[in-house]
Amino acid sequence: MRKDVVLLVGGAQGSGLETTMQVLAPAYASLGYGVLANREYFSNIVGRHSYIHIRVSSSGEARPLYYPADFLGAMDAETVFTHWDDIGEGAFLLYDLGTARMRLQQIASMEPDLRSRLMQQYREAGIEPFTVEKVVEYLEREKRVRVIGLSFTALFDVLIKKHGLSRAQAQRFRSSILIGAIAGLTSLDREALDLGLQRRFGSRPKVLEINRDFIASVADEVEKEYGAQLKLEPAEPKSGEYVVASGNDVVAMGKVVGGVRYQAYYPITPASDESVLLEEFEGLKIDGESLGSIAILQTEDEIAAVSSVIGAALTGARASTATSGPGFSLMVEALGWAGKNDVPMVITYYQRGGPSTGLPTRGSQSDLLFSLFASHGEFPRIILSSGDHLEAFYDAIEAYNLAERFQMPVIHLLDKFLANMVASVPFPDWKAIKIDRGKTLFKAPTGPFKRFPRDQPLADRPVLGSGAITWYTGDENDEYGHIDEDPVNRLVMYERRWKKMEIADREIPEDFRVKYYGDEDAEVLLVGWGSVKIPALEAIERLREMGVNAAYLHLRMLSPLPKRRVSEVLSRFDADRVIAVEANYLGQASKIVTMETGFMFRKYILKWTGRPVYLHELVEGVLDIVRNGRDKVVLSYGK
């Protein structure tokens, strides 16, 4: 038995890969295992190559992804060709015998660059002709890979005969073959597997029953023939409940708990899933009792979305939008209007690869500096960045609290990696959740109201309809909101806005904004933000086992940066032992740290391919810097 198993399943977009993840993740999680799963896919509805990367851990916690995988399940020939070098010694490969004679040159959906690289790699390995059969033979011979060759056509024939399906209908159960094989090799408890199936197909009884039968038959055949070679140790005992959800899901959940009453959006990857889930909660009820409603509006564009959010926030509603890079680019003028007028709106920003359309379905951390300086002029904003699923849940709530308490826009930064990763997440601690509406007034004295008093950076905020008469304009204004270009007024009002940031810097606890992980006497410090936290925490454990005492400094709030605490931690380390780890080219967070503290980074581990930072390559990168004196390591693993 093993502590972890890493699974890789691939196939054409639209062939049921996501179903594999949706069934297996809750099945393993229900047994107490930690699960983390990532889906990589092209900007394409049907046909292009897509794959799911899953790690199941007996530790009970969702652990970071790494290669090589213990199992590769190939729905098509392209998966075998593409991922032939992603599996380790003695791993399992399941493939369709019907694809054995397929040639690499026949894969029309494969990008030319990848095909050329694979041809070169195959020639160097002595794999010719370039067929699935030859690749499989090589893996058996050179890497002792245990091959499970199944005739998908024969399996579908049985399915057609037994359940009266058409050939086209039977093809829809392609992912069930992979689920069955994985269930057999890991000896997955059938009740747990059934839980996963019911979660996915519970509303379609006939489809559920066919899947149960088909998956069980494949699982029995594979386990009988190959044994439960990937069986996991029993999960370590843990307390409390867990939920299986993506980053998009937990942010939506957090917003509901945090009291969102209005969200506007224009569809964009990878942000849309959050708003789509929120639409399911438009009418809030518990035990039949209505708790109110959420208005979710899909607007004609991002300008309309953010502008309507501003309007909703001025009425006193907790209001937000969710977007990605191109959408945020359209929102920046309205962001400036909100910053100038003390509007407490929230922008949930899921980063993807840019510039322009860039890599619309791939991840990135390249928009941090853009978030910090977006829109013309100078005005305060809070930038909060979540490192994992649980942080994303709490941060979705805290973003509203911070926006209303400090009366400024809050940008909640996430990335595609976290958005699309599905994880087993500890159920939130309700006692830790607090709602802070700041100085919001729902009833105020009637008549003209000093919304922007010169001597009060954080003044009472009467909402529209409260009775008070308030004015909001894009021009510089006086205390009542009327346009006023007087230089003395300009001086005072400008400072008034920035004093809010000074107050936020004093009042937001530093232990919330930054977290140090590791031994106090560590010799190497990794500094990162966002989803880098996921691989970094296990990386420092592995490095310690390899004789490198490393720690991780997680930057959760980038504006205002907790510069005093960050400076104190950095001062304990030799500059050559401090490594910035980021999924961008410039090392953007390190530049903010330098700007705020004066500390000059000399060492970098960076990645900008659009694929996640994997555990194994991060560990290798740190060792390369520590042992070989490298200044910069560029990571590139992933297909």
From Swiss-Prot:
Catalytic activity from the UniProt record: a 2-oxocarboxylate + 2 oxidized [2Fe-2S]-[ferredoxin] + CoA = an acyl-CoA + 2 reduced [2Fe-2S]-[ferredoxin] + CO2 + H(+)
Temperature dependence of activity: Optimum temperature is 105 degrees Celsius.
Keywords from the named record: Oxidoreductase, Pyruvate
Organism from which the protein derives: Aeropyrum pernix (strain ATCC 700893 / DSM 11879 / JCM 9820 / NBRC 100138 / K1)
Subunit structure: Heterodimer composed of an alpha and a beta subunit.
PANTHER family in the cross-refs: PYRUVATE FLAVODOXIN_FERREDOXIN OXIDOREDUCTASE DOMAIN PROTEIN, PYRUVATE-FLAVODOXIN OXIDOREDUCTASE-RELATED
GO biological process terms held by the UniProt record: response to oxidative stress
Cystine pairs: none
InterPro entries in the cross-refs: 2-oxoacid/accept_OxRdtase_asu, 2-oxoacid_Fdx_oxidoreductase, PFOR_II, Pyruvate:ferred/Flavod_OxRd, Pyrv/ketoisovalerate_OxRed_cat, Pyrv_Fd/Flavodoxin_OxRdtase_N, Pyrv_flavodox_OxRed_cen, THDP-binding
Summary of pH dependence: Optimum pH is 8.
Domain of life per record: Archaea
Binding site for substrate: 269, 352
GO function terms (MF aspect): 2-oxobutyrate synthase activity; pyruvate synthase activity
Keyword match rRNA-binding: no
Protein name from the UniProt record: 2-oxoacid:ferredoxin oxidoreductase 1, subunit alpha
Entry's EC annotation: 1.2.7.11
Entry remark concerning the domains of this protein: The Tyr-Pro-Ile-Thr-Pro (YPITP) motif is important for the turnover of the reaction, presumably through its flexibility and mobility.
Protein function: Catalyzes the coenzyme A-dependent oxidative decarboxylation of different 2-oxoacids such as pyruvate, 2-oxobutyrate and glyoxylate to form their CoA derivatives.
Motif window: YPITP motif: 266-270
SUPFAM superfamilies linked: Pyruvate-ferredoxin oxidoreductase, PFOR, domain III, Thiamin diphosphate-binding fold (THDP-binding), TK C-terminal domain-like
